[in-house]
Design a protein with these regions (language model features):
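Catalytic beta-strand/loop cores that center a nucleophilic Ser/Cys/Thr
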Residues: 148, 153-229
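A glycine-rich, often tryptophan-bearing local segment used as a flexible ligand/cofactor-contacting loop or short
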Residues: 106-176
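Extracellular ligand-binding/catalytic regions of CAZymes and related secreted enzymes
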Residues: 39-42, 49, 57-60, 64-73, ...
């Protein structure tokens, strides 16, 4: 009888210990930080580099650098393509943002164009670099998306670039200005009211009397953000020269822009 009683005590103690352990687990769950969630998978970025006009020699390098930036970030991954069939409603659902380094009138069908606009309008991201504004001059909706058109590049030199808002998280690390050597775009048809300019050319650093300079006042914008529906749009006119793509500052701007456009910060 005593042996039975001892066995019962051992079992009872085991049950109590198990209950205490479960309670401890419950307590740990209760104090989990608010908003904690399993690690999110990387955001997928579709990098589209079709050239219907001039093709930039730097495009292969840009693919390598963007792919590496994504891998290093752990937050996004880049798929590069020149295949317009990627622009179907179903396929775009796989991506968080689309980035253009393009020229000319791209061979996209009306359905593909609608799919792109609806994709961004629904809350996804769109990013354009350099000649993305030298694209789709005959499609007015594209101008509404990107915010301006390329209007010549009279300067190919080292210039001073002003940081319009040094407090903006996308460019705060740059300070008040930076010096860059690149092909410098002029922008026409710029939607100044609907855009937030981040970087602008300091006109005192160039010859405004040079042939091809247009004295339209758009504030010499070079990099900006805007919204299209619920979607976030980023554009930078920089990115012609390999040295720009290899510049840590430019890489950080693009990384920040991708994070912003996909709502992963900054």
């Amino acid at each position: 009888m005593l042996g039975f009683f001892n066995t019962w005590l051992v079992l009872a103690e085991a049950i109590v210990r198990r209950r205490d352990f479960i309670a401890l687990l419950g307590g740990a769950a209760a104090i989990r930080p608010l908003g904690a969630h399993p690690e999110r998978p990387p955001e997928r970025i579709l990098y589209f580099t079709y050239s219907a006009g001039y093709r930039h020699d730097v495009i292969p390098l840009s693919k390598v650098i963007l792919t590496r930036l994504g891998s290093n970030s752990g937050v996004f991954e880049v798929t590069a393509t020149e295949d317009t069939s990627e622009f179907s409603t179903e396929n775009l659902e796989r991506y968080a943002a689309v980035m253009f380094y393009t020229t000319g009138e791209l061979p996209m069908s009306d359905a593909q164009k609608r799919a792109l606009l609806n994709f961004v309008r629904s809350g996804r991201g769109f990013l354009g670099v350099h000649s993305a504004t030298d694209t789709f001059y005959t499609w007015p909706d594209y101008l509404d998306l990107v915010g301006g058109y390329f209007n010549g590049h009279p300067w190919h030199q080292s210039v001073k670039i002003e940081v319009v808002d040094p407090g903006d998280p996308l460019v705060a690390f740059l300070g008040n200005s930076l010096q860059v050597e690149d092909e410098i775009y002029q922008i026409s048809d710029f939607d100044y009211r609907g855009s937030r300019v981040l970087l602008r050319l300091d006109p005192s650093s160039v010859d405004l009397g040079k042939t091809g300079v247009h004295q339209r006042f758009y504030g010499w914008p070079l990099t900006w953000t805007r919204y299209y529906g619920e979607g976030r749009v980023f554009y930078s006119a920089l990115g012609h020269e390999p040295s720009v793509w290899q510049d840590d500052r430019y890489q950080r701007i693009l990384t920040n822009a991708i994070l912003w456009s996909t709502r992963r910060s900054p």
